[in-house]
Amino acid sequence: MKTVVKSYFGSHLYGTSTPESDVDFKEIFVPPARDILIGNVKEHMSKNTNNTSSKNTKDNIDHELYSLKYFFKLAADGEPVALDMLHTPPELVVKSDLPDVWKFIQDNRSRFYTTNMKSYLGYVRKQASKYGVKGSRLAALRDVLKVVNQIPEQWVDYQEDGSIKQRRTKVEDIKHRLPENEFCEWVFHNHEKTGPQTFYTVLGRKYQTTLSLIELKQSLNKLDAEYGERARKAEANEGIDWKALSHACRGGLQLLEIYKTGDLVYPLQDAPFILDVKLGKHPFKTVQEFLEDVVDQVEAASTEASKNGMQQKVDMSFWDDFLERVYLENHRSYYK
């Protein structure tokens, strides 16, 4: 096995580490030639010093390894771990058996930038939705509730013979009545195993068309209650996962930098602010408004980047060709 790169990750990469931070390493490797040939490659491995369910301490080391092929997939999917690794500065690299391979990847990292970095943006949106009580979001939720709370939970089907049959009302039955806006929309997925599926999404939560109206009501009313409780806790700075919130702020700022400058530099310019968020030094309302504003800015910057020619999807043929060359050279050096 040859190491393409092994480097520091997490807070040590972002510039947000504290004396209590554990150490994270990420590594990309080229698997042994024989394992590739016989189809016995482990694409993803972990070597952690803490194998218990207890929280890591500053003495723990997390070490995750990805095959080069798997890393390219993660990067193409817009996974934060891969996009973060692409921007590792040289001083945080601790090992590289194939420095030319790593240099080529870093020199061409912009080929992984798209206007649709779903996994990355998805995480930021999820946190914004989780902690956001923005008026427009709440209004959108209550517009849906206004509709569903008025519809009978039993649906009547009229049979050809004139008889009637009662059953539970489903989301499918009322789809023409459900509002559509920036927070509520229909999405379609063509799943490999289950085939085409349709979902109604409300504030990022998905509801399949086969779901009963009763279940939809329960979920949405619970969400409405959570928003109310969240607003109360926000005033008192209670129940906030500051670390998760800091990750969301960081992710949003990183995406914004990529869309605006075409690159990303570590340690982050905003590292002091992100660290303060992580340590709970800012009022929740301040962070909440900041995060919601960043999400709006990222959406706008993504649209602008698209107009300026940024691709919507990663061209994997480029990376497949490169992967072939690297693996072929690996085979030749092993079997010479």
From Swiss-Prot:
Instruction: Extract the InterPro entries matched here.
Output: RlaP
**What is the species listed in this Swiss-Prot or TrEMBL entry?**
Enterobacteria phage T4
Top-rank taxon: Viruses
- PANTHER family assigned: NUCLEOTIDYLTRANSFERASE
Q: What is this protein called?
A: Uncharacterized 38.9 kDa protein in nrdC-mobD intergenic region
- Source gene? y05G
Task: Recall the taxonomic lineage recorded for the source organism.
Answer: Viruses, Duplodnaviria, Heunggongvirae, Uroviricota, Caudoviricetes
